[in-house]
Amino acid sequence: MGNIHIQTKSKEYDVHVGKEALSHLTMIVQNMQPAVSNVMIISDEAVASLHLQTVIDALQVEQDVFSFVVPSGEKEKSFENFYAAHTSALENKLDRNSLILALGGGMIGDLAGFVAASFMRGIRFVQVPTTLLAHDSAVGGKVAINHPLGKNMIGAFHQPEAVVYHTPFLQSLPKKEWRSGYAEVIKHALIGDVELYHWLKEEVQTLADLRDEKLIHILTKAIPVKANVVSQDETEKGVRAHLNFGHTLGHALEKELGYGNITHGDGVAVGMLFAIFLSEQVYKVNLAYEDMKQWFLKYGYPKMPRDLNVERLVQLMKQDKKANAGAIHMVLMQEYGVVNVVSISDETVHIALEAFQKDMV
């Protein structure tokens, strides 16, 4: 069992990680001041069928507990479900002392968090992540829904009261979701914990190694990387953008291929490889791109699709939240553990993407 303390300018809270983390949930709710009036659990159909009753049973409180369940999938992080959640909250008489509990992966955490941020101008919420990917999204307070023209374009910064990372919930994940979440673990290692990066290369030979004590070790090492960045820059005015390493191309791939047709982590993995590929050219350094590519492929991460239109990807990358005055800004790597946000011309990105696409045969 491991506890990680998160400190930001707006709030302090704990991340409870381990096989018995769910046992903390009742005390977390009971200790809140002012007292919680009622609880609304937001989940998706897949997670609810597996874990909703377990959480309700663990939540031994006197307050009324309601649930709002949406279909599964990234495309459900929509305005329609956001609006429907508000309707459910009003129908169940939630008020400013109510608590929203986000039970699910990153999609649910984002959706439920944004509902909490906006309902009556902001009420409290707790994250109960059920995926490895959510070790990233559940911490830091970024909550959002998607717009047809871009991912996470409508949202807010709203920190949770706590994060309860009950690792047994992860055991039901399909292989593609383990791989997706592991990409964000790799990202945290590359940008902020080089020792963790070397440990991963030695200790995680296959995705099946992401279990038991190794899993808890990974979570208690990767989450503090994000916590450290968020403590310095809660609202992404500076160094927090470093957490977007791999995301400029990754988000473009998700948008171009269609949400749900490529997992977030697979997109980020391709994006990280491209960022390393481009970083070697921009900084004139050797980042062992070829070794990194083989390491990623060993885990089953996809190659850059050969049939995608490069110019279309460039235009999508210009819609990224880091873009400024229509110019692409990417997180590039000077060396392992040292990254910077860099403005890159469309032409440079286009040429590099074409070369990267050909290299990923």
Curated annotation (Swiss-Prot):
Pfam families: DHQ_synthase, DHQS_C
Pathway named in the protein's UniProt entry: Metabolic intermediate biosynthesis; chorismate biosynthesis; chorismate from D-erythrose 4-phosphate and phosphoenolpyruvate: step 2/7
Main location: cytoplasm
Record CDD domains: DHQS
Highest taxon of the lineage: Bacteria
EC number: 4.2.3.4
Sequence positions that bind Zn(2+): E184, H247, H264
Cofactor: Co(2+); Zn(2+); NAD(+)
GO-annotated cellular components: cytoplasm
UniProt catalytic activity: 7-phospho-2-dehydro-3-deoxy-D-arabino-heptonate = 3-dehydroquinate + phosphate
Cofactor: binding comment: Binds 1 divalent metal cation per subunit. Can use either Co(2+) or Zn(2+).
Localization per record: Cytoplasm
GO biological process, one term: amino acid biosynthetic process
Record's keyword annotation contains Zinc: yes
Keywords: Amino-acid biosynthesis, Aromatic amino acid biosynthesis, Cobalt, Cytoplasm, Lyase, Metal-binding, NAD, Nucleotide-binding, Zinc
GO molecular function term, any single one: nucleotide binding
The keyword Nucleotidyltransferase belongs to this UniProt entry's keyword annotation: no
Known function: Catalyzes the conversion of 3-deoxy-D-arabino-heptulosonate 7-phosphate (DAHP) to dehydroquinate (DHQ).
Similarity field: Belongs to the sugar phosphate cyclases superfamily. Dehydroquinate synthase family.
Protein name: 3-dehydroquinate synthase
Organism: Bacillus cereus (strain G9842)
Gene behind the chain: aroB
